[in-house]
């Protein structure tokens, strides 16, 4: 296990999981657009996200994020030096992130067969949050494109669960407005339409 920036606001830990998969833990101060920033950072670092758990502290000041990812350049396990280099690269890309940051192209081919796309929404009235589940075909940059939709609509991601099974993804997000008010039906319809454009982009 390689841990960088133990005493700083940004903590990154990387370790080999199994085969060519890596487990990446990132603890950082919560901020607007954080999930978009993390997704773009990992893509720029040459990583493809396979699985993820995103959680915010109860006061929403801190975010603890665990990603399972694979490196696009090779299919072997990382050496300790490579894990250290990767951790430092993630920190560097995170700190240098900006709106002009380009998405890393991992060369993944467009899928020949498309999975059925489904976007469902439900409201947890007790917590005042919406739960959106997206099932669709995977493609490079999909997760950051989804995160961008949420960011552009001033939504905060309280928690998220990302699952990739072969060429299919099933992503669930617990969302709320930044102003803590319940997302209106009209706004949710707009968000779902934007998500449809994103997930159908490569169909």
Show where each model-derived region lies.
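Regulatory modules associated with amino-acid/nitrogen control
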Residues: 1-203
């Amino acid at each position: 296990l390689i841990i960088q920036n133990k005493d700083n606001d940004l903590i990154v830990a990387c370790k080999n999981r199994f085969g060519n998969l890596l487990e990446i833990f990132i603890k950082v101060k919560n901020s607007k657009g954080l999930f978009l920033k993390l997704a773009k950072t990992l893509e720029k670092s040459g990583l493809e996200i396979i699985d993820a758990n995103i959680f915010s502290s109860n006061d929403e000041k801190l975010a603890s994020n665990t990603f399972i990812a694979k490196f696009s350049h090779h299919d072997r396990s990382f050496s300790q030096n490579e894990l250290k280099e990767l951790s430092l690269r993630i920190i560097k890309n995170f700190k240098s992130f900006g709106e002009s940051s380009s998405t890393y192209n991992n060369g993944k081919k467009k899928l020949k067969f498309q999975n059925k796309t489904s976007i469902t929404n439900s409201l947890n009235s007790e917590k005042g949050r919406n739960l959106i589940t997206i099932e669709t075909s995977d493609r490079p940059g999909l997760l950051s494109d989804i995160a961008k939709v949420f960011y552009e609509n001033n939504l905060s991601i309280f928690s998220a669960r990302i699952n990739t099974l072969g060429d299919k993804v099933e992503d669930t997000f617990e969302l709320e407005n930044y102003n803590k008010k319940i997302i209106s039906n009209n706004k949710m319809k707009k968000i779902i339409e934007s998500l449809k454009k994103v997930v159908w982009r490569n169909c």
